[in-house]
UniProtKB/Swiss-Prot annotation:
The gene is CES5A. Glycans are attached at residues 163, 245. It catalyses: a carboxylic ester + H2O = an alcohol + a carboxylate + H(+). It is an enzyme of class 3 (hydrolase). The keyword rRNA-binding does not apply. Component of a epididymal complex at least composed of soluble form of prion protein PRNP, CLU, BPI, CES5A, MANBA and GLB1. This is Carboxylesterase 5A. Keywords: Disulfide bond, Glycoprotein, Hydrolase, Secreted, Serine esterase. It is found in: Secreted.
């Protein structure tokens, strides 16, 4: 399947020798969904005089399947991203871009990808700045245990009528299946995520950060002020959105965050102390999720980068888009993904890709400002 491609958006005047800054976008989607084709970089490119490249990489079982040995090491999605960056280095000047001024940026799984590329020795010299929105490589629970991987291998083997005890035989069997069959299997497995493969990741990620074994490039790391306000909990545990008592919150702290029962009460005391209404407890629980998955990992990563001597900027996006007023409950603030439409100038797009309907004049001004900030960083760091 020919699934690896990239799209290039350039100002009308760009030509070989223009040496414009290059911004390479990595789409999000939990490494399960998402596509380069749903993002239109033309507004950002034309307003800010930069080249915008959106790339596709393999997802799910196609992007992360591994057998735990040399026969299928995994991290294929990251290898796709490296290949895209190599292509940019070799070809972007023919579109008016400067291969010595490449900024990688992404949101959610795309930001996790950017953060991972910073940690990999395979990407030396392939980019020069990085922007991570709502995601970094050390987000908890991205790495599956050996038990979970082996359990998923058995599940796959059973569904496909393959032999899971031998990696070579399993791979040969799976390669005989259609992409549609493998895609349906991918939706039944959860453990195929990043692995320390000795190549892309030579060591555990926190060890790489602590030992300063990563690329010291200028970076922007950011979060929204309600990362788990609606989109993510709606997918995983929608029952919480109508309100929560402390019993349900404690149950979810244990089951979702895998915090032992004896410690969950310490967390509850920190977040739910003097909170009694169902709505107050819900709001604090959603704040807790945002802190665990996005805010704290982002701050920890920023501190490691700073300690290593790399320039870091940290932001919090706080605006709830007006176009979502009837699509999300009133209590939701700036939810996960809400900033993307501003960064890409969605309000100014006129093509088939709709990113920002009914933007107010104030939102258009905010979008212009964010595009300018992102592009200025791409130009000068």
């Amino acid at each position: 399947e020919d699934c690896l491609y990239l799209n290039i958006y350039a100002p009308a005047h760009a030509e070989t020798g223009s040496k414009l800054p290059v911004m390479v976008w990595f789409p999000g989607g939990a490494f399960e969904t998402g596509s380069a084709s749903i993002f239109d970089g033309s507004a950002l490119a034309s307003y800010e005089n930069v080249l915008v490249v959106t790339i596709q990489y393999r997802l799910g079982i196609f992007g992360f399947f591994n057998t735990g040995d040399e026969h299928a090491r995994g991290n294929w999605a990251f290898m796709d991203q490296v290949a895209a960056l190599v292509w940019v280095q070799e070809n972007i000047e023919f579109f008016g871009g400067d291969p010595r001024c490449v900024t990688i940026f992404g949101e959610s799984a795309g930001a996790i990808s950017v953060s991972s590329l910073i940690l990999s020795p395979m990407t030396k010299g392939l980019f020069h700045k990085a922007i991570m929105a709502s995601g970094v490589a050390i987000i908890p629970y991205l790495k599956a245990s050996d038990y979970e991987r082996n359990d998923d291998l058995q599940t796959i083997a059973s569904i496909c009528d393959c032999n899971a005890s031998d990696s070579v035989a399993l791979l040969q069997c799976l390669r005989a299946k259609s992409s549609e069959e493998l895609l349906s299997i991918s939706q039944k497995t959860k453990s195929f995520t990043r692995v320390v493969d000795g190549l892309f990741f030579p060591n555990e990620l926190l060890d790489l950060l602590a030992q300063k074994l990563f690329h010291l490039v200028p970076s922007i790391i950011g979060v929204n002020n309600h990362e788990c306000g609606f989109l993510l909990p709606m997918k995983e545990f929608p029952e919480i959105l109508g309100g929560s008592n402390k019993s349900l919150a404690l149950q979810l702290i244990h089951s979702v965050l895998h915090i032992p029962v004896q410690y969950s009460y310490l967390v509850a005391d920190e977040y739910f102390h003097n909170k009694h209404s169902l709505l107050d407890i819900r709001n604090r629980f959603l704040d807790l999720l945002g802190d665990v998955f996005f805010v704290v990992p982002g701050l920890v990563t920023a501190q490691y980068h700073t300690d290593a001597g790399a320039p870091v900027y940290f932001y919090e996006f706080q605006h709830r888009p007006q176009c979502l007023k009837d699509r999300k409950p009133p209590f939701v603030k700036a939810d996960h993904t809400d900033e993307i439409r501003f960064v890409f100038g969605g309000a100014f797009l006129k093509g088939n890709i709709v990113m920002f309907e009914e933007a107010t004049e104030e939102e258009k001004a905010l979008s212009r400002k964010m595009m300018r900030y992102w592009a200025n960083f791409a130009r000068t760091g």
